[in-house]
């Protein structure tokens, strides 16, 4: 994770291999994002599709969201939500539908939708069609794209040619320039968030930018006033690629996006960065080690055996001041000069187009891609589990034991008829929306049961603590020779009024000292039991 990030990657399971060359000019396909805008006034094909969908009265409305978006198969899942392929039923355009639990601690889809609306119409940025709430989830509908650069990097043997890196780098710089032109900085540059288009489309090999959950305004859109410089900021982004200033806790600006791009370029060229694989007891110390390694690594040592222009690029962007505007065109010319030195041209030919004997990538042959960060083999929350304290582990162990006891009781109470009925329940396709709904309902039920169990465990612990405190008080009173205090039941009786009627006890004056310990303990236990019964938890 890297840091907490909500990556979303869009892909489709039935994508075929890429045909045709890419248009390297990132401005040439500006109208692509407008072809899919919702509009009832479409071609005759669109009208026919709409008529057919309206005439089908038996359609399954449970798989339709946002009025006319049909949910298909699940194509990705991660700690922040689930991704489905879908179809616009009005015009037949394929879309990606992102689901996010509404009760999540840090919802991001609404803010991401606002960012997409700001960027709508920008070349090679997915178009956002809809945001809304469906049951227990927020949903976001955007353009469906192809695999990420990280996926393609894997398929190509975890190393790109210099020519491919140059062409990819030029497009990535242009994407970030367009983002900066809209007064936004990205703050989470990584290969997972740069995708190519769908096969058969004019932009099939164009690089697209997705997932704006970490994006932030660096200046006021009206006054163009830049945000102030600050320090002691928390880390935002992916540690492998973030800038040195970000490691130092400094406010991010345009320069940090450009430096992170440079780290990605070297990642593609080398296949590995010097600060990868560092070990540390926890994430905080690991990020510190990564930052120290970045500072101690000379850019030209990093570029050893590679075109010197890449080292020069990283040196330039690291020297930018906080508010300085990057020279995007100068960076593109610098990197394109690498192709001149090699006698190559930016002809839109990429390494992934040579896969499978020149047929291009194919999901039926290549492994399933890392779908916009969903389904990542090492999600951030998995790493943090290794560093939990002993107290939390003990609580979890107690919870597990309590759950096992309840499961055993439920299993024992299950009748033979229930067992027979469960065997004949139809199995759902795990990639279907119905399966996801069922899974979500089960998850919320489990969370509710877990909260109830935690509450019960806390009440039991509280009761034990109160008993221990009462016993300690009684022991102290007996040690000093003072008579024990009145039973707790009398105080609680006064608190709860006439509804609470504890068993009457003889007065302390009529009891012998030998009677006090037993009487006090029994009355305390009874009083606490009655107290929790009134709360409805025993």
From Swiss-Prot:
Q: Where in the cell is it found?
A: Cell membrane; Mitochondrion membrane
Please state which protein family the record places this protein in. Answer: Belongs to the protein kinase superfamily. CK1 Ser/Thr protein kinase family. Casein kinase I subfamily.
- GO CC annotation terms, alphabetical: cell periphery; cytoplasm; endoplasmic reticulum; mitochondrial membrane; mitochondrion; nucleus; plasma membrane
* KW DNA-binding (keyword) present: no
Listed PROSITE patterns: PROTEIN_KINASE_ATP, PROTEIN_KINASE_DOM, PROTEIN_KINASE_ST
For this entry, the protein name equals Casein kinase I homolog 1
Q: Which residues form a coiled coil?
A: none
Enzyme Commission number? 2.7.11.1
Lipidation sites, kind S-palmitoyl cysteine, are 537-538
Modification comment? Palmitoylated by AKR1.
Outline the extent of the Protein kinase domain.
69-353
What is the gene name? YCK1
């Amino acid at each position: 994770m890297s840091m907490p990030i909500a990556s979303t990657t869009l892909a489709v399971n039935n994508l075929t291999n890429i045909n045709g060359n890419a248009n390297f000019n990132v401005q040439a396909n500006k109208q692509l994002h407008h072809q899919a805008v919702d509009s009832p006034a479409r071609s005759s094909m669109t009208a026919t599709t709409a008529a057919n969908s309206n005439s089908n009265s038996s359609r399954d409305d449970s798989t339709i969201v946002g009025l006319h978006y049909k949910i298909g198969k699940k194509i990705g899942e991660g700690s922040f939500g689930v991704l489905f392929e879908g179809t616009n039923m009005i015009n037949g355009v394929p879309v990606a539908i992102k689901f996010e639990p509404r009760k999540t601690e840090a919802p991001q889809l609404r803010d991401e939708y606002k960012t997409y609306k700001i960027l709508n119409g920008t070349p090679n940025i997915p178009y956002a069609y809809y945001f809304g709430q469906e049951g227990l989830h927020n949903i976001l509908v955007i353009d469906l794209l192809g695999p990420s650069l990280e996926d393609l990097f894997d398929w190509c043997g975890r190393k790109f040619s210099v020519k491919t890196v140059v062409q990819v780098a030029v497009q990535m710089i242009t994407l970030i320039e367009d983002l900066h032109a809209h007064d936004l900085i990205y703050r989470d540059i990584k290969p997972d968030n740069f995708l190519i288009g769908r096969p058969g489309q004019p932009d099939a090999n164009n690089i697209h930018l997705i997932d704006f959950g970490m994006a932030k305004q660096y200046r006021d859109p009206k006054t163009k006033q830049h945000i102030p410089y600050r320090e002691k900021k928390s880390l935002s982004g992916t540690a492998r690629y973030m800038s040195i200033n970000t490691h130092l806790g400094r406010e991010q600006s345009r320069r940090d996006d450009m430096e992170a791009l440079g780290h990605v370029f070297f990642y593609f060229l080398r296949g590995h960065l010097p600060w990868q694989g560092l070990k540390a007891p926890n994430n905080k110390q690991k990020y510190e080690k990564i930052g120290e390694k970045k500072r101690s690594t000379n850019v030209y040592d990093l570029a050893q055996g590679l075109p010197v222009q890449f080292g020069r690029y990283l040196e330039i962007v690291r020297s930018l001041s906080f508010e300085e505007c990057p020279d995007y065109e100068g960076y593109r010319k610098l990197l394109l000069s690498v192709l001149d030195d090699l006698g190559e041209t930016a002809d839109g030919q990429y390494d992934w187009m040579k896969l499978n004997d020149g047929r291009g990538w194919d999901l039926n042959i290549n492994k399933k891609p890392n779908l916009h960060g969903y389904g990542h083999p090492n999600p951030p929350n998995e790493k943090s589990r290794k560093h939990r304290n002993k107290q939390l582990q003990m609580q979890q162990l107690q919870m597990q034991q309590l759950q096992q006891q309840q499961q055993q009781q439920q299993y024992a109470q299950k009748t033979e008829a229930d067992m027979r009925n469960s065997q004949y329940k139809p199995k759902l396709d795990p990639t279907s929306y119905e399966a996801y709904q069922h899974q979500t309902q089960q998850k919320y039920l489990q969370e509710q049961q877990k909260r109830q169990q935690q509450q019960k465990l806390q009440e039991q612990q509280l009761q034990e603590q109160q008993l221990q405190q009462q016993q300690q008080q009684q022991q102290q009173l007996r040690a000093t020779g003072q008579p024990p205090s009145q039973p707790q039941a009398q105080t609680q009786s006064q608190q709860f009024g006439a509804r609470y009627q504890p068993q009457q006890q003889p007065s302390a004056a009529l009891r012998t000292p030998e009677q006090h310990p037993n009487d006090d303990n029994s009355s305390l236990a009874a009083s606490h039991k009655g107290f929790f019964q009134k709360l409805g938890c025993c």
